[in-house]
């Protein structure tokens, strides 16, 4: 019974994260090493679960160990320079065959639908094709890379059509040129460019390591870009982990909101990273100097630090962490150097075409610099997107600030009926409204 209760508790706490990811696009790199992990079948089951939750998946497949084996079987040596495999003409066939075998293995696993397994009735559709246009690396520092190449572009329109038709898209590490040539690409480059050009919500890279560790061998659950730069400069990472971190860093600096490094050996690592507060690996985020954006589930901790002092003073109505998580899609935030310095929420009443402006808060050290104004404009823009005509608010302490920005005092009777029923007469808040 205790296990069942633990499961129910976990499922309840994960629901805000599930809602936050529904409809989002994730690019996930599965390296060749993952295919040989005892945990590989669990990864397949977790991908099927993500698909069933309405998450759009673009999978990128690597094949480094399989290529090494294929070359070894022919007693051919392989040369790696600056993280790229040199691919002479006589080795290209080995690369193609090894990559194709891995692709077929992945497609077969995703097609499985045996009863009494997690894949029962999954009905996954996996599409792959010539969606990666490539060009040769050429000769760099005197080294001829042969048929090794780099991503020129991703066929965004074709991939979007497949995703909209509920297909999972599979991109191998092979690219094709307009002249009909095949190029061996670095899988991390394919994943990074796919995430950037598709404007994906996340880039996720599986590695053997659980993530990035500090000098005390403790896992970083989150890294800002400048911290990642420092770690890369130290030169202490394995080549595979270094490739992964460089790819994640490039993605977030190109406006992919977040990137993640997780272990392909950890059972449930992907689900834990996406659907729990603690996660399982390392998340990499950009050092945004300051930006206004929609809140995400990862912002809840920072928002609580911002809101709790105001709640303690009675300025704001108290909200639990669970409530914030469940209502996270209502919030916008201002983020500065990775910290949440301001937030506000919009609660729409669609029938009355009105919206409540609530939970407006700016960190004390950042007040007086028009951040409240930016929040208000952001909420007004969001209200117009939702075809609302009016926004209203209840306040006990900040009436003049809103009056100066076009709000007018109104009566309780002017509020939507549901809001009237929730009015707290003990707080005796004043009511203000503004036509949009």
Where are these regions (language model features)?
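N-terminal glycine-/serine-/threonine-rich phosphate-binding loop
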Residues: 1-58
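Polyanion-binding loop/helix "lid" in catalytic or ligand-binding cores
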Residues: 40-43, 88-118, 156-157, 163, ...
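Ligand-binding beta-strand-loop-alpha-helix segment within the catalytic cores
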Residues: 72-170
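Short amphipathic alpha-helix that is part of the acyltransferase structural core
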Residues: 287-317, 428-431
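A conserved beta-strand-loop-helix scaffold within acyl/acetyltransferase catalytic domains
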Residues: 317-363
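Conserved acetyl-CoA-binding loop-helix of GNAT-fold acetyltransferases
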Residues: 362, 368-385, 393
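Conserved beta-strand-loop-alpha-helix junction that forms the acyl-donor binding cleft
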Residues: 391-403, 408, 413-419
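C-terminal "cap" of GNAT-fold acetyltransferases
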Residues: 415-436
């Amino acid at each position: 019974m205790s296990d069942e209760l633990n499961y129910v508790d976990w499922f309840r706490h994960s629901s805000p994260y599930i809602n936050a990811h529904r409809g989002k696009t994730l690019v996930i790199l599965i390296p060749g090493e993952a295919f040989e992990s005892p945990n590989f079948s669990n990864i397949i089951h977790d991908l099927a679960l993500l698909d069933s939750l309405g998450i759009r998946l673009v999978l990128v497949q690597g094949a480094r160990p399989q290529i090494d084996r294929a070359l070894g079987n022919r007693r051919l040596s392989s040369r790696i320079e600056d993280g790229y495999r040199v691919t002479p003409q006589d080795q290209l066939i080995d690369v193609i065959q090894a990559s194709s075998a891995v692709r077929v293995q992945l497609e077969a696993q995703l097609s499985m639908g045996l009863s009494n397994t997690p894949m029962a009735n999954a009905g996954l559709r996996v599409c792959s094709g010539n969606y990666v246009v490539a060009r040769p690396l050429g000769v760099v520092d005197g080294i001829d890379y042969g048929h090794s190449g780099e991503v020129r572009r991703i066929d965004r329109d074709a991939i979007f059509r497949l995703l909209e038709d509920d297909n999972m898209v599979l991109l191998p590490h092979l690219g094709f040129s307009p002249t009909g040539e095949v190029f061996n690409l670095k899988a991390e480059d394919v994943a990074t460019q796919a995430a950037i050009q598709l404007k994906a919500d996340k880039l996720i890279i599986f590695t053997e390591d659980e993530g990035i560790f500090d000098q005390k061998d403790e896992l970083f659950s989150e890294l800002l870009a400048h911290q990642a730069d420092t770690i890369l400069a130290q030169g202490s990472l394995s080549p595979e982990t270094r490739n992964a971190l460089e790819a994640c860093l490039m993605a977030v600096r190109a406006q992919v909101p977040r990137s993640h490094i997780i272990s392909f050996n950890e059972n449930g690592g992907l689900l834990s990273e996406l659907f729990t507060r603690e996660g399982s690996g390392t998340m990499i985020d950009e050092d945004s100097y300051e930006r206004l954006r929609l809140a995400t589930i990862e912002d809840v901790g920072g928002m609580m630090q911002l809101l709790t002092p105001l709640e303690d003073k009675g300025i704001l109505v108290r909200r639990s962490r669970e409530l914030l998580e469940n209502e996270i899609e209502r919030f916008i935030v201002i983020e500065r150097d990775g910290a949440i310095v301001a937030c506000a929420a919009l609660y729409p009443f669609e029938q009355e075409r009105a919206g409540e402006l609530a939970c407006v808060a700016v960190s004390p050290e950042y007040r007086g610099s028009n951040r409240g104004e930016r929040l208000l404009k952001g909420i007004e823009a969001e209200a117009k997107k939702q075809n609302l005509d009016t926004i209203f608010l209840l306040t006990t302490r900040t009436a003049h600030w809103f009056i100066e920005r076009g709000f007018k005092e109104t009566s309780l009777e002017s509020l939507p009926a549901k809001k009237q029923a929730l009015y707290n007469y003990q707080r005796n808040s004043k009511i203000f409204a503004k036509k949009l």
